Amino acid sequence: MARMKHTARMSTGGKAPRKQLASKALRKAPPPPTKGVKQPTTTTSGKWRFARFHRKLPFQGLVRKIWQDLKTHLRFKNHSVPPLEEVTEVYPCQTIGGCY
């Protein structure tokens, strides 16, 4: 290994001065209490997505159960279930609509 040269380093004269702690304490202070009734939180986009996904689960379970009776070991992609749901809703409406 090659020999490394040691360069002289200037001393800083001890520790560097620190910031005042009062400003840090002010930032961490709790917010002032609000008066009146607390507003309910609005739903975020993530919650809305979960609600839409959760709504599709019962129909998807029904489709899986029906197909398990016909054939075993079938897998469904997420985008294949909504068209089935749409057709399932439209067919009875058209059938009943043509009766009267």
From Swiss-Prot:
GO terms for molecular function: DNA binding; protein heterodimerization activity; structural constituent of chromatin. Keywords: Chromosome, DNA-binding, Nucleosome core, Nucleus. Residues 1-46 are annotated as: Disordered. GO terms for cellular component: nucleosome; nucleus. It is found in: Nucleus; Chromosome. SUPFAM superfamilies: Histone-fold. Belongs to the histone H3 family. PANTHER family: HISTONE H3 (PTHR11426). The nucleosome is a histone octamer containing two molecules each of H2A, H2B, H3 and H4 assembled in one H3-H4 heterotetramer and two H2A-H2B heterodimers. The octamer wraps approximately 147 bp of DNA. This is Histone H3-like 2. It comes from Lilium longiflorum. The lineage of its organism: Eukaryota, Viridiplantae, Streptophyta, Embryophyta, Tracheophyta. The gene is gcH3.
